[in-house]
Amino acid sequence: MRVGVIRFPGSNCDRDVHHVLELAGAEPEYVWWNQRNLDHLDAVVIPGGFSYGDYLRAGAIAAITPVMDAVRELVREEKPVLGICNGAQILAEVGLVPGVFTVNEHPKFNCQWTELRVKTTRTPFTGLFKKDEVIRMPVAHAEGRYYHDNISEVWENDQVVLQFHGENPNGSLDGITGVCDESGLVCAVMPHPERASEEILGSVDGFKFFRGILKFRG
């Protein structure tokens, strides 16, 4: 399975994601911000980092690059797309997932391990979990607080993917830290599954996100 890992100026988690995708058994390849055709890929991951230095706001400039038009085409072709941290912010900016990820309630960079509850298993990335399973992954962001004007609609549509369990470190509405589109194929999560994919890192809970992509495609 060929999985694209998108690189923007300022991305810094692309090599980590590429490494974990290889461990999961995928065939990852780097994709640059100016590529206009991704038809040869089976799925895409938009990794974390600080695309374009987070100027204007996190993800705002990356959202208008040529590669994001190609990502929209992949979505129309019903191929899975995962955005992690800055990647989640980018997906929200382009409107592929509901709501926004904005400045933390305390205006500081938040970097810590968190406990999370998996709220839906209908996405390719959470299909190997059980609903309401509690997992452990780290977060690292300054603009990760989730907000939506009509949060009841997000819950009713089963679009909440991850929710903080216990402590809500950034003030996200309802503790939400991961959402998906209505199809479940586009998933945006602020925690870093690639940083929780090997025993030496302290958790392997995140590895299921990447194995799930392969399982989804059979």
UniProtKB/Swiss-Prot annotation:
Keywords assigned: ATP-binding, Cytoplasm, Glutamine amidotransferase, Hydrolase, Ligase, Nucleotide-binding, Purine biosynthesis
Pathway: Purine metabolism; IMP biosynthesis via de novo pathway; 5-amino-1-(5-phospho-D-ribosyl)imidazole from N(2)-formyl-N(1)-(5-phospho-D-ribosyl)glycinamide: step 1/2
Active-site positions on this chain: C85, H192, E194
Subcellular location as annotated: Cytoplasm
Subunit-structure text: Part of the FGAM synthase complex composed of 1 PurL, 1 PurQ and 2 PurS subunits.
Top-rank lineage group of the source organism: Archaea
UniProt keyword Nucleotide-binding, yes or no: yes
Primary role: Part of the phosphoribosylformylglycinamidine synthase complex involved in the purines biosynthetic pathway. Catalyzes the ATP-dependent conversion of formylglycinamide ribonucleotide (FGAR) and glutamine to yield formylglycinamidine ribonucleotide (FGAM) and glutamate. The FGAM synthase complex is composed of three subunits. PurQ produces an ammonia molecule by converting glutamine to glutamate. PurL transfers the ammonia molecule to FGAR to form FGAM in an ATP-dependent manner.
Record NCBIfam families: FGAM_synth_I, PRK03619.1
Pfam family, one: GATase_5
Chief location: cytoplasm
Designated name of the protein: Phosphoribosylformylglycinamidine synthase subunit PurQ
UniProt catalytic activity: N(2)-formyl-N(1)-(5-phospho-beta-D-ribosyl)glycinamide + L-glutamine + ATP + H2O = 2-formamido-N(1)-(5-O-phospho-beta-D-ribosyl)acetamidine + L-glutamate + ADP + phosphate + H(+); L-glutamine + H2O = L-glutamate + NH4(+)
EC number(s) per entry: 6.3.5.3, 3.5.1.2
GO molecular function: ATP binding; glutaminase activity; phosphoribosylformylglycinamidine synthase activity
